[in-house]
């Protein structure tokens, strides 16, 4: 027997954009069943915490968030607390014993069952099947990003066996979506007003090897550029498989953003071998050079890990020199987290935590100088910017992003002079540079026909901004 009374729902999402997509599928599924989405957890009868368990700090954040939401069962309207995602997949059985206040634990392949689970009067407390699910274009989904941008998950799981990574255990082997299904969802997003598609997967460049006919990422991109969006951005493109055909599509198709998120993790051959990355430093440097040469204006984001077991001072100096030489426009640095169940967990020569933190600070300081120098070179330049809306700090500024700035993880462009609709792609002139952000003025807006298309569901009039108001620089 199923309950039919509509309930209020609050969703908390932790972790990566791929996890966000899972949350959006749950939101769509539950709204389809009559649930009302609320902005405050204290107003919700049902709270869902979609967790991350990639590294130690992420696990702790997930546990803290669950406990925070559990307090609302005592004092607020919450009647049902559901924990989903990677933490449930990894520790669901243990957590069910330690957290009696949680009603249900769903693994990474069970989130699509959440509607049936909540509708039934009697349902299991743990639903943690082997990870084998991925949604399709027919699955209800609510885009939780600003309506002009969206993540598009093209595959789930990973067939790599990187020594430091627990993801294949949590998410299963690679499962690619067929090209026509991905294109169908992309069209749905475009019809809803999305201007920017951010392609995500555990391993973007391995796309298709598990499908009949073994299509490649460049085949998918050739199909996606036919969709009515302005930018298509590539995230998590592993360097191990990077054919020339992919580089050619990136260089020749205007809709493919001049931006690439490609995690290299380290440059020491000894550590790359122990990490099981499948490529050496010579290959990585050659690929980076090829990308810079063949894709003019490419903004490169990468991620590195410091403190891997066996990382010596010589290895670390090599890494710092690599960062100085390559001058990545965007860089994320992770402190190694010793995760039980990974190959690296059993490696000898662990690096002390204080030393890991020192190395992290050193690399970030180098990158901060690089960011500042690169941003200063943009002053006086003209850029195309996707306007997102009023700045969080003040309604007298607009914020947006140029092609070299991905949502959530990179800097912003603050617009302090001109008119623009949220969702418009406008031409700006950069007037000021900070370490991570830029300040600019609008110099050209789209033609009226495009303006009508992008603003159809936005504001009734373009948003003005006060001339020459400066945003406060961000501390990062």
UniProtKB/Swiss-Prot annotation:
Protein EC: 2.8.4.4
Subcellular location: Cytoplasm
GO biological process: tRNA modification
Cited Pfam families: Radical_SAM, TRAM_2, UPF0004
Protein name: Ribosomal protein uS12 methylthiotransferase RimO
Alphabetized PANTHER family for the sequence: RIBOSOMAL PROTEIN S12 METHYLTHIOTRANSFERASE RIMO (PTHR43837), RIBOSOMAL PROTEIN US12 METHYLTHIOTRANSFERASE RIMO (PTHR43837:SF1)
Superkingdom of origin organism: Bacteria
Organism of origin: Myxococcus xanthus (strain DK1622)
Lineage: Bacteria, Pseudomonadati, Myxococcota, Myxococcia, Myxococcales
Co-factor(s): [4Fe-4S] cluster
Primary gene name: rimO
